[in-house]
Amino acid sequence: RQRQMCIRDRGYKTVFFGGPMDEEMVAEATGYMQTRPIIATGHFAIGGLAAAMRRCCLIITNDSGPMHVAISQKVPIVAMYGPSNPKLYGPYTKDAVIVTAQPPCQGCADGMKHSCDDLQCMSRMTVEQVVAAAEKMLEK
């Protein structure tokens, strides 16, 4: 809700991208929102996703394939990193801010081997960190 208020107050709209497997998570997230977002989960193949992202002024994403699609379209991003290492996986662009909880175990997913059960790398990340990163990118 805090993130949406920040974005709404600036006149931006929220768009959710993702595959069909993301629809339940997106439905849950939209339940916390005061204004209706654009829901585009399950609507695009890779080329369509690239074209749709190109129209965005900022993408907030996790370390995923769509993050790299946004980068390929030269869209500024806020990339949330959990267990994977941004030095290894990118983003390799000046148009990105990386948000991480910086747990002592970061990098445990290198080679796709997750070695913890509590995912401190995700649970310690805050809305405030992501909002601050988004504001920084939107001010550029």
Language model regions located:
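Nucleotide-sugar donor-binding patch of glycosyltransferase catalytic domains
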Residues: 31-32, 39-40, 71-140
